From Swiss-Prot:
Keywords: Acetylation, Cell membrane, Magnesium, Membrane, Phosphoprotein, Transmembrane, Transmembrane helix, Transport. GO terms for cellular component: cell periphery; plasma membrane. The modification Phosphotyrosine is found at Y77. The lineage of its organism: Eukaryota, Fungi, Dikarya, Ascomycota, Saccharomycotina. It is a multi-pass membrane protein. This is Magnesium transporter ALR1. It comes from Saccharomyces cerevisiae (strain ATCC 204508 / S288c). InterPro entries: Alr1-like, CorA_cytoplasmic_dom, CorA_TM1_TM2, MgTranspt_CorA/ZnTranspt_ZntB. GO terms for molecular function: inorganic cation transmembrane transporter activity; magnesium ion transmembrane transporter activity. Belongs to the CorA metal ion transporter (MIT) (TC 1.A.35) family. Residues 1-281, 330-399, 830-859 are annotated as: Disordered. Plasma membrane magnesium transporter.
Amino acid sequence: MSSSSSSSESSPNLSRSNSLANTMVSMKTEDHTGLYDHRQHPDSLPVRHQPPTLKNKEIAKSTKPSIPKEQKSATRYNSHVDVGSVPSRGRMDFEDEGQGMDETVAHHQLRASAILTSNARPSRLAHSMPHQRQLYVESNIHTPPKDVGVKRDYTMSSSTASSGNKSKLSASSSASPITKVRKSSLVSPVLEIPHESKSDTHSKLAKPKKRTYSTTSAHSSINPAVLLTKSTSQKSDADDDTLERKPVRMNTRASFDSDVSQASRDSQETEEDVCFPMPPQLHTRVNGIDFDELEEYAQFANAEKSQFLASLQVPNEQKYSNVSQDIGFTSSTSTSGSSAALKYTPRVSQTGEKSESTNETEIHEKKEDEHEKIKPSLHPGISFGKNKVEGEENENIPSNDPAYCSYQGTDFQIPNRFSFFCSESDETVHASDIPSLVSEGQTFYELFRGGEPTWWLDCSCPTDDEMRCIAKAFGIHPLTAEDIRMQETREKVELFKSYYFVCFHTFENDKESEDFLEPINVYIVVCRSGVLTFHFGPISHCANVRRRVRQLRDYVNVNSDWLCYALIDDITDSFAPVIQSIEYEADAIEDSVFMARDMDFAAMLQRIGESRRKTMTLMRLLSGKADVIKMFAKRCQDEANGIGPALTSQINIANLQARQDNASHIKNNSSTTVPNNYAPTTSQPRGDIALYLGDIQDHLLTMFQNLLAYEKIFSRSHTNYLAQLQVESFNSNNKVTEMLGKVTMIGTMLVPLNVITGLFGMNVKVPGENSSIAWWFGILGVLLLLAVLGWFLASYWIKRIDPPATLNEAAESGAKSVISSFLPKRNKRFNDRSKNINVRAGPSNKSVASLPSRYSRYD
């Protein structure tokens, strides 16, 4: 008989499932490379036995009703444990009742361990087994019980679950070091639980809970994974300020140091590139928004900020060693933040002392605020300075946080990356991060007004952590989050379960910037009651739309679809000024091509090339917008006609499955109630928006056609200008040829004169040597006579030469020699007459092969 039977005999109360779980826990895959027979190895993990009295008390306690939610305290960002792949079905609530652990708890512990082992990937199985073996070591040391809260990262808020799924557990621990044996059931060894005394436990039981039964959505992986964190039923002492728990970041699977850590990191990077179907949403959402997720992230970010402030108080030699670990909100993955966030790097100005610079900055800001209040308003609703726009002089702009303003003697100017706007409010809240959106004592539920009025959250250069929080809080699909994070460049409209996603392009409109006309991607997530916008560059469209909303609030029903239309319309209108400037440039260049003769041809060619480049850039930006608007309008018409989206893609099929799962889950869990009439139906644009979209499409088509016309003008002007340059080059060559011809004529006239003077200058007896001076005048007169005669003869021959009438004749004349140009050309009529005479003549003695033809002219 194998060792498994002996272990079962030693434990008569152990069920078959427990024996199987113990057998699976005892496997060590790292020690075996071949086939493995688990029956050859004994069970090494003993099972705890509880007395019947404790068992009965624990079962009686497990049927107690849950305490309602009162206040938010424990968050899943405070401590995170990555245990592996655990099914996400069923809620596990563990509360301390001052008693031990019975066999039922041990049974579920072993079953959970078996599930952990069976669902784990092979690369992590060897690493998970040694940790699981430590979870079930029998402790002989009796310590007073304690409140241990273990919360799964994504749990169900169901108060009517059975005692098998919701077994209440109490784990005992003391103030002894961590080296003592632990009794927690499903807690990984990496989670260190602080110990408390019995008196503290009872005092905590008497105090109300701050946060209970908070629910979050499930996380998706290759196997349905569950990240276990602190329990939702954990009780926190609100009055005890000295016992504050240090927040712990969520540990990813790549954070464990083991033999297969590198393989785990590679596997995690592979999983991040793959989008999985969304599991059923298990959150308690209000108008589609999970405010608990935002509150938890805000508490986590504030705790990390306070930790950063505390690190500033350490000596200077420790600052530089910890600066890489404390600065910023870095994510737990390999990419700590978005690369586009570098565009918003704060400007640094060196100061003498940190305290003095901070005080001076505060005094200067107070003076500016007082000056703005005293200054009379010339035009109501319009203010200047501090980058404000019309109607935003009362905006809630939080002051600079000392965590960012001063560090190591430098002052930073924090950019506002988040803007929140509500249709029923005249103020726009600007903040540098998500926690700064709410003021002290305010919650996100109050900020969004429960999500009932139309809200708008604008995010500029979101980090990975912020993007993850927003995706979970607003139910954004992983495909949409991936498109935003990877900055998808294709313009499109996609329909999802609870929203539709629009990707649209704008451009940098600052003419002084070196990135002028560079495309900027704008991503719009349109929900039923609000809009989310993301961009990775500074744009002014959001401020323009907010000003437009304030002006038309009394005339237009401002909803999420109208905000999306207004933003697209403002992006489209931003192309008009640039296109108009190109129109003026095209007219000026077209006139300059035929009129300007003395201008620099290099500057003119550069001007034409720059204008053509701008035109082609705008055409590329506008090329896909008409199709997007057409698709958008079609969706609106389908909504008006009552036609739903076709199930022609994997995305819609996955959304339909997720909707069915959500419906079945809501039907089965009657205790989880949504406080409003939020129904998870497929979201489509409103039908009345199609009329406005038609106007945008007309503008896009008109601008694109104008750009096509301007591009043709620039192309024709470029060709004409090059032709003008060629004509001017031919004219210059002709002038040079004429000048050389005149010089040659003068030289020809002087040659015979040199002959005559040379003859009389010879040392021989010449006529008139001994007589009068009349010979000298006679010779001079003959020379002048010859010169005048030669001049008249040359002028006669030059007049008989016909100037070139065409460019081909000019080219032929330029190719001829100077002497041949003086030969007179025959008259055209004479040439035609001679050809006719030759044609009428009889047959000649020449052969047919010697006659020119179209086949032999090039031989």
